[in-house]
A protein has these predicted regions:
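Active-site activation/catalytic loop segments of kinase-like enzymes and analogous catalytic loops
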Residues: 222-256, 272-288
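ATP-binding pocket architecture of kinase catalytic cores
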Residues: 43-136
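Terminal low-complexity/disordered tails
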Residues: 144-146
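ATP/Mg2+ or Mg2+-diphosphate-binding catalytic cores
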Residues: 155, 276-345
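All-alpha amphipathic helical-bundle segments outside canonical DNA-binding/catalytic cores
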Residues: 117, 259-269
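Conserved NTP-binding catalytic cores of kinases and kinase-like/nucleotidyltransferase enzymes
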Residues: 1-85, 203-206, 324-345
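An alpha-helical support segment within catalytic cores of ATP-dependent transferases
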Residues: 7-18, 137-139, 150-193
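Active-site acidic catalytic loop and adjacent metal/ATP-binding pocket
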Residues: 34-44, 49-50, 81-82, 176-223, ...
């Protein structure tokens, strides 16, 4: 249950009054999520979400709010924080930051029912985020750079049980490999960093809202796209080539990948899988969390993806590599043609 800070009916009614929502009709703690406390409020002015940040500092909360307000100003479908009667987007509650957001009707993406049309729309929305975010000038520290993940792994590694020897060997090898083969000089800007099924609210094939900007930072666009591929194009056993092609088609309808990005794509997929394997191992072995959250955030989901991406087991990697090679060759062809056209003038 993701309700770590309990609010009684009186406290919830006071929040409703302070945010000008008339009166509290009903309130429900939300079980989804594993980091923050969330309540769904029903009021005469619609449904709203109360969020209490359990781990973020006030500065981190302010940075996240600044970003979502910027994105909303530019028409991006993301959470809409509302202000209280004093004009504040967040307030203090029990030494934590509390904020209230408009609630979006719709439902999270259902992995088993994800269609080609929906994947194209998700790809397009992600490219829109990257395009809009290029003009965001405020810095947001990247908590998931290679250096930080490598440091985190050293911390986690010392806590892993002895029967994890095989997993440790794989992770040791992957951390060393990526240190030498991750490309740093790639297009960067604001990225979401955590584009999973439950962070995408949809109605039919329309993307209503992208949620959860807690991991958003300035980073490589191709890493963000790789994370979306790992989250949305894996069917539980294999990477689905048709899903991959649909997601990329939607993305490139707004923003074409560069040659360097196509070239870096396989390693960014591996780094994304490594990142979530390590952070979930941390959550399991280092952080005290709800038992249900342990089940929902099983590190093995991404460890198995990593094994496929390393070609240690079958799972559709060959198809992805072929598609990425084709994308690289086509982008190269486009570049050559553009140069020829320019030279003929």
């Amino acid at each position: 249950m993701a309700v770590y800070t309990v609010l009684d009916k009186r406290e919830l009614a006071q929040i409703v009054e302070d945010y000008g929502l008339v009166k509290l009709v009903n309130a429900t703690g939300i079980a989804a999520g594993s980091v923050n406390t969330n309540y769904l409020l029903e009021t005469p002015r619609g449904r709203h979400l109360v969020r209490i940040d359990e781990v973020k500092s006030e500065l981190e909360v302010k940075r996240e709010l600044d970003l979502v307000l910027f994105l909303r100003k530019h028409g991006f479908p993301c959470p809409q924080p509302i202000t209280d009667r004093k004009g504040r987007h967040y307030r203090e509650h029990d030494q934590k930051c509390l904020s209230v957001y408009r609630y979006y009707d719709g439902h999270p993406v259902r992995p088993a029912r994800i269609s080609a049309g929906l994947l194209e729309n998700i790809g397009r929305v992600l490219a829109d985020l990257h395009t809009i975010g290029k003009s965001y000038k405020k810095g947001i520290d990247n908590r998931f750079s290679y250096e930080r993940i490598a440091d985190l792994y050293l911390e986690v590694r010392s806590k892993l049980p002895s029967y994890f020897k095989k997993i440790v060997r794989t992770l040791d090898d992957e951390v060393e490999y990526l240190q030498n083969y991750l490309e740093g000089k790639l297009p960067k800007g604001i990225i979401h960093g955590d584009l999973f099924h439950d962070n995408i609210i949809v109605k039919g094939e329309k993307v209503v809202a992208i949620l959860d900007f807690e991991a958003a930072c300035r980073g490589k666009f191709i890493f963000d796209l790789a994370t979306a591929v790992n989250a949305l194009c894996f069917d539980g056993e294999n990477y689905d080539l048709k899903r991959f092609e649909s997601l990329i088609t939607g993305y490139e309808s707004l923003r074409a990948l560069s040659l360097a990005e196509w070239d870096a794509f396989p390693n960014e997929l591996r780094f994304s899988a490594l990142r979530f394997t390590i952070t979930r191992l941390r959550d399991f072995f280092l952080n005290p969390v709800d038992e249900q959250a342990r089940v929902n955030k099983d590190f093995r989901e991404f460890y198995e993806r990593l094994r496929i991406l390393r070609r240690e087991r079958d799972g559709g990697m060959e198809g992805l590599l072929m598609a990425m090679a084709t994308g690289y060759d086509y982008r190269k062809y486009q570049k050559v043609k553009a140069l020829e056209k320019k030279g003929s003038k």
